[in-house]
A protein has these predicted regions:
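Active-site-adjacent betaalpha module
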Residues: 2-4, 33-37, 41, 59-194
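Solvent-exposed loop/turn segments at secondary-structure junctions
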Residues: 12, 53-55, 139-141
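A short alpha/beta connector and helix-capping loop motif
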Residues: 1, 19-48
């Protein structure tokens, strides 16, 4: 079965945000590097996806200089690097065409954020008929503030707020939502030791 690794938003933009200090997986680049090495060694496709917000002046604006793969990661020659402007790597991109032209039937998804772009891409891939594997320990997220929380609070206050959704809860919820419905949940070790 032909498969592709789809790496979603593992980019320097996230490291520039104050909440990265509370990331569930600050060493995500190492996990992704290990996956990429394995896929390359097996001659399998890798697609790198970057999130962009042109003209916003944020760390996701290409003008910021942070819209690039995290330090320690590099696309090899022939590996597509595509940009997206939504939470879904299929929407506003040519990802579907790349996968179809390569005869891909299974996608392996990893990236940032666990419950946003990585999960959304996973759900859409399943809806498009792909067999999907979600590499839970090669994703990362940060705490989510309650919808009624005041904006601009320091990270310590966000983390202390009992209404904040903590990273372990986010990851568990994502696993429950995806497993057996949209994807098979696997770990880096399981995929690299096959």
């Amino acid at each position: 079965m032909k498969r592709a690794l789809v790496v979603v938003d593992v980019q320097e933009s996230f490291r520039q945000r104050p909440n990265w200090a509370a990331s569930s997986n600050p060493e995500i680049a190492k996990q992704v590097h290990r996956l990429a090495d394995t896929f390359r060694a097996r001659g399998e496709m890798i697609v790198w996806v970057l999130h962009v917000e042109p003209g916003t002046g944020t760390v996701f604006d290409p003008e910021s200089g942070y819209v690039r793969l995290m330090d320690g990661l590099e696309a090899a020659e022939g590996e597509p690097v595509i940009t997206k402007t939504s939470f879904n790597a299929f929407y506003t991109t040519n990802l579907q065409q790349l996968l179809t032209s390569a005869g891909i039937v299974e996608v392996v998804v990893c990236g940032i954020r666990t419950e946003q772009c990585a999960e959304t891409t996973t759900r859409d891939a399943a809806g498009r008929g792909y067999e999907v594997t979600f590499v839970i320990d090669a994703t990362a997220t940060t705490p989510i503030e309650h919808r009624d929380a005041l904006p601009g609070r320091p990270l310590a206050e966000i983390l202390a707020d009992p209404r904040t959704l903590q990273v372990d809860d986010i990851i568990a919820r994502t696993e429950y939502a995806l497993a057996g419905r949209f994807a098979t949940i696997r770990t880096v070790a399981e995929l690299t030791d096959e």
